A protein has these predicted regions:
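A short beta-strand-loop structural module common to alpha/beta enzyme folds
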Residues: 21-31
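Short, well-ordered alpha-helices that flank and scaffold nucleotide-derived cofactor binding pockets
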Residues: 12, 16, 38, 151
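Short, well-structured alpha-helical segments in soluble
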Residues: 34-41
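Extracytoplasmic ligand-binding site segments that recognize negatively charged/polar headgroups
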Residues: 1-8, 29-31, 43-173
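Short alpha-helix C-terminal cap/hinge motif
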Residues: 9-23
Length: 173
């Protein structure tokens, strides 16, 4: 969920500050949630840090996370405070980021393809087999992409879009 460099830095600082030996395991949000669910009766995870909001809210709703009201909560953005309240203080948003798609300009130029500018552009036949997407079952970001499309288009049109996009997907990572 969080970039490896951030995980390494956080782990180093935490270990130095507390003297505790830690083991950081990097996973997608969906995979992390599945592990917490599987370990519900015998938890092996102490801290789940990072990832998209929806799986954290699901974990809170399922009773997989503990209540914690940070003394720094008032310093966070209003959306993060709302997430904490909504979850009964069992999760809190710590960062946000844009959702979009990236492309390889050199590959597009080599194949004489126009730069995709909208989600609809990714449906064009010239992109058949050229699009990669993370698996929403294991990636919180891919899950968030689907949730965003549902919010933008409505559920029926969003899933029609995903069905139309599928032939252009070369790999679900």
């Amino acid at each position: 969920s969080v970039q490896a460099e951030w995980c390494s830095m956080i782990g180093t600082v935490y270990a130095r500050t507390t003297g505790a030996k830690i083991n950081i395991v990097q996973k997608g949000s969906g995979e992390a949630l599945a592990q917490l669910m599987a370990e519900k009766d015998n938890p092996k995870t102490d801290v789940w840090f990072g990832g998209t909001g929806d799986p954290h809210l699901q974990a809170a709703e399922l009773g997989l996370t503990a209540e914690y009201k940070s003394p720094s909560l008032a310093d966070l953005h209003p959306w993060a405070q709302q997430q904490a309240r909504q979850s009964g203080y069992k999760t809190v948003g710590i960062y946000s980021g844009p959702l979009g798609f990236g492309y390889n300009t050199e590959l597009l130029a080599k194949r004489k393809l126009a730069v995709p500018k909208t989600w609809a552009d990714l449906l064009k036949p010239e992109f058949k087999g050229e699009v990669q997407m993370a698996n929403p079952a294991s990636s919180g970001t891919a899950y968030t992409m689907i949730a965003t499309l549902v919010q933008l288009m409505g559920e029926e049109k969003a899933f029609e879009y995903l069905k139309a996009l599928h032939p252009n997907i070369s790999t679900y990572t």
